[in-house]
Amino acid sequence: MIDPAGLATLGTARLRFATVLGAALLATPALAADAGHATGAGPGTGAGDARAWLERMTRALDTRNYIGTFFHVSGPRVETMRIVHRDRDGRVTERLESLDGAGREYVRHSDGRLICYFPDRHTVLVATRPNGAPFLGGLPKFGAGVDRFYRIRELPDQRLLGHRVTVIAVDPKDQFRFGYRLWIDRRTAMPLKTELRDAQGHVIEQILFASLTMPARIPDRDLEAHVPTSGVRWIVQRPAGEASAGAAALRPAALPPGFRLTVAGAQTIGAAHRPAEHLVYSDGLATVSLFIEPRPQPRAPAATVTPAPVPAPMRGLARFDSGFAFSTVVGGHQVTAVGEVPAQTVEFIAHSVRAIDGRASPVALPTVLSHR
């Protein structure tokens, strides 16, 4: 059975670890020395400047080479991590390593493979994300339709650690998503500081870089995992087409405004290798993972065999450091929605799951339920 608490790490890290990184970056003077990658003063002042800065930041995160060590602060938890990102002729390879505790690592290959190493669980998870975003790609970016659900505006420039920065506010228009603040370096377009904020404006997640460099070349050895793999259990996420027929028939009948299906995959869970479908819904910034897992069924015991107990289903809301998970049971399946979004978003999606034609597209609500 899927553990909602573990989904914050294994599910959204996600198989989208990027949203875990939707928070604050503090760069060091090494950034200012990046004269070879300087992109000029950037956009001036005007109505479209905030969007232009988000577009430049997105390009910088996608296409630059960079190596950094940062502190990820989420609730009371602080974790030190190191990221290596290389773009070689449009082929991106990345490695993300936890420098604390168990020493977990994540490697994203240019062929779409995402390999997650969990030495504390003696497990390696292999997923396929053909068009997967970079690990820092969960930071806000401007895309078609995003401004229907967020107010995007430029705030007065500031100075941060000796750098001139442009400050961008991304505020939600309804109760289904969180907001952001970003401090973007005007020379390199890299985000030097960001914040993920709740509806009350409280900062709920941060990342602070202790070092950040952008070398012209990154050798292959810097992108190789350092975790021993002898004797570990390998879990391979299967393509979406191999999901069980029962799981494929379950879909949200409705979604919060702006959310749509962006990724569909399947994996096996537990020693019994039960199939679990993994669906990702996004509005362009916020992301929710939906896991649909067949519930184990009790078997008629043999005369001399005591039947194994069937675990109780998970139901209700659970909070992790910077988001929520909501679990329920639909048609004999455990359904769990998890994401760095308000509680009502995961509840809405999980509660809307119905047995429908797997080919049908869930519809978004026609209007935003409330505005701030």
PLM regions with names:
Residues 232-333, 341-348, 367-372:
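Short, solvent-exposed recognition patches
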Residues 2, 33-37, 44-122, 148-197:
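N-terminal mature ectodomain segment of secretory-pathway/periplasmic proteins
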